[in-house]
Structure formats: C-alpha cells, structure tokens
Amino acid sequence: MRCRLLLPLVILSCAVCGVSAGEWTPLFNGKNLDGWIPKITKHEAGVNLHDTFRVEDGILKVSYEGYPEFDGQFGHLYSEKSYSHYLLRMEYRFDGGMMPDAPHYVNLNSGFMVHAQSATEMKLNQNFPVSVEFQFLADEGKGHRQTGNVCTPGTLIEIDGET
C-alpha cells in the first residue's frame, strides 16, 4: 500500500528508511518547503495561508500567529512523494499555546498521517484527510495525556478480523 505523509507538527528532523535499504533518506531539506504541499481547511491545496508552515533555523514549524481567529482552519502538510515499506524517524516538540476559539481537543495535539488521501483529493471544507494518524499529545498540566494514539479520520482499522 502506498501512502503520503502529512505532518501537522513541529519537526526538528525527519527521515525515512526503506526496510531493506538500511540508509535513511531525509524528507525535509532544512531550508524551505520544497517537496511539501500545505492544505488548510477552507483553502485550496498549495496555499500556505498566513505562512502557517515555515522553516526557521533549519526547523520546520507550524504557527497560527498570523490568523485573526482559528475558524476551523485545520492545517496539514503533505509530502509530494509517496512512500511504502518505510520507517519514520523524527524529533518534535510543542511550543506556545492555542488560539482562543480553537476546539479544546486541538490543544497541544499534532501527529503524522499515513495512507492518506492526497491534498488535492480533499474537499475545500474537509477538516481532516481520510487517513491513519499517529497522534502526539503534550501535557496540558491537567494530568497525564496518552500519546501515540492511532486516530482514523474517515477510516476503520481491522485487527484480527475486528474493527
């Protein structure tokens, strides 16, 4: 099965490795967004509204600081290339808070999505791509939050014949 990676998160480094290849292939060049397609709800694929996704000091960052309000504008960043039979290695961290009008569940919430529909296949007002997401959740200071959850927007996962 082929997939596209989308990374709505702050990435410090990111690479994939073919199972048999043994060598890591960087996905992010550390300089710019070449090879990546932004998709933000309510906007066409390829529009990087308010510079949501940016590169600063070699770090890929996601920021909503240019938005007057969140207004349901979920952001996703797609790799232009498709991958299969891969391992993914990355470093990430959360920095800053959320917008006042954003839903509570997006606070310190990010992840990467695989086996996803493409950015151009998403409808204009579609919040999340049909995909499998490996979710990152940070501590909000209210007690432990489970991280590494699997979310399946628009999909079902079958394990041992059960969904």
Predicted region positions:
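Bacterial N-terminal signal peptides
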Residues: 8-17
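Carbohydrate-interacting regions of secretory-pathway proteins
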Residues: 19-163
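Bacterial N-terminal signal peptides that target proteins for export
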Residues: 1-7
